[in-house]
Amino acid sequence: DHRDLHSFPTRRSSDLPMQKNYVQEILSIIHSGLPKAELAEKLSDYHEKDLADALEALTPAERQSLYSILGVDTVAEIFAYLDDAEPYLKELPSHEAAKVISNMDSDDAVDALEDLDDTDKNEIVNKLDKDSVEDVKMLLSYDEDEIGSRMTTNYISIKNDMTIRQAMSELVKQAGENDNISTLYVVDENEHFYGAIDLKDLIIARAEESLESLIVRSYPYVTDREQVSDCIDRIVDYAERSLPVLNDAGKLVGIITSSDVVELVDDEMGDDYAKLGGLTGKIGRAHV
């Protein structure tokens, strides 16, 4: 829904309840002495951002114990919310750090690795699992001012010659490893970008319909070597949940998500400017 945000009723901030700070609750649970299984169950009720905020108040030994209780998948999600992952990664043996990084989305993994010096970074990268190392090395190859350095490889990709049933099957297959499923990106037999399909359109399509009839061929995109400063306005103006990123050959190499755009706006223009200009409001419409 791309109606202007001003058309929606709003509440004054004074009418809203204050956001609860869960960090103290989390710390109390961690220090409670509960059995590990019960501890893990209680902590699973909290958002990974709040768990990340609690790490700073723990000792290194407490953090190590917490990681073993939560498991590598949850720890990877927590690390994605750290402003500076360096001190926490350096507490881990390099093979353990590599397990955490391997379980992060590629863009979050690169953000965490870029906090490290080159020696520590390379040691971890060389121990990443084979599914992660290619994507991480690709993202690290871009200059920080290029769009490619900000994209993620976490997206759903399907072939343009599939049937509706095949596309649905492929969606289910890929969805377990990908969070960004609201838009499906379509490629041809040579992996060139072909168009995009809205998830809702695929779900309600009849099996006898052609996939081609659902594909938006003229879907907006950016290229991986574009400067962030040159295309940020264009990305914001489209107000999509994500946009495809293509290389010079026209192949799909990643996507830029709405959360990536918020970070771009903050980095390029500053948070205050973004709010004054209504840019974060435009981005927010992508979620409506």
What are these regions (language model features)?
Residues 1-13, 287:
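Short, small-residue-biased leader/transition segments that mark boundaries at the very start
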Residues 12-13, 185, 283:
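Compositionally biased non-globular segments, especially hydrophobic aliphatic-rich helices
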Residues 16-276:
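Hydrophobic packing positions in regular secondary-structure scaffolds
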Residues 279-285:
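Cytosolic juxtamembrane amphipathic/interface segments immediately preceding
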